[in-house]
C-alpha cells in the first residue's frame, strides 16, 4: 500500500517518486469556449454550478480555451445531465462534453520539483504499456503529477509507473 504522511523529516531522496495512488470511476466534464481565459468569473460560474448540485470536484485542469472538471461518478449520479444543462445556461460554452470511465492516478514526490524528466518517465512508462493518457494535471509546486486513464487500464498503469520508479 501507499502511505501519505505529513512528516517531512523522513528520508526522502531528492528527485524520486515517493508514492503512487489512484482511484477509479470518475467523469471529466470539459467545457470549450474561445477566449475563455479573458472572461472574468468563468471558473467561478462553473464551480458555482457544481456547488449548487452538491458535487465536489477532484481536479480541475485548465487551458486557454478549455476547462475540465473531474468528479466522482458517485457524486454525479443522477445529476450529470442537469449539471451539463446548467453549465450551458451559466457560461454559454462552445461545447460541453462529459466523458466517463476515467481512473485517476497521483504520482507523488517532494523532490520532483528539482528532477528533470520525471513527468517524461511517467508518460514513457504508460506509453510502453500502450496506455493512453486521457488527462494530465500538474501544479507548479510539482509535488504531484495526476494522470487520467481508462478504468480498464488502471491496474496496468499503476504497475507501469511503479516499475518505472521502484524496480
Predicted regions and their residues:
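C-terminal catalytic "cap/lid" subdomain
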Residues: 1-140, 144-167
Amino acid at each position: 500500500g501507499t502511505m501519505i504522511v505529513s512528516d517531512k523529516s523522513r528520508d526522502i531522496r531528492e528527485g524520486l517518486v515517493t508514492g503512487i495512488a489512484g482511484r477509479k470511476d470518475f467523469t471529466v466534464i470539459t467545457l470549450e469556449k474561445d477566449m475563455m481565459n479573458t472572461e472574468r468569473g468563468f471558473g467561478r460560474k462553473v464551480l458555482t454550478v457544481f456547488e449548487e448540485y452538491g458535487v465536489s470536484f477532484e481536479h480541475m485542469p485548465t487551458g486557454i480555451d478549455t476547462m475540465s472538471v473531474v468528479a466522482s461518478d458517485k457524486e454525479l449520479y443522477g445529476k450529470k445531465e442537469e449539471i451539463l444543462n446548467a453549465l450551458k445556461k451559466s457560461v454559454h460554452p462552445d461545447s460541453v462534453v462529459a466523458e466517463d470511465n476515467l481512473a485517476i492516478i497521483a504520482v507523488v514526490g517532494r523532490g520532483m520539483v528539482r528532477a528533470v524528466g520525471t513527468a517524461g518517465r511517467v508518460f514513457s512508462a504508460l506509453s510502453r504499456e500502450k496506455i493512453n493518457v486521457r488527462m494530465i494535471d500538474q501544479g507548479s509546486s510539482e509535488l504531484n503529477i495526476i494522470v487520467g486513464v481508462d478504468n480498464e487500464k488502471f491496474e496496468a498503469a499503476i504497475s507501469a509507473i511503479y516499475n518505472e520508479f521502484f524496480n
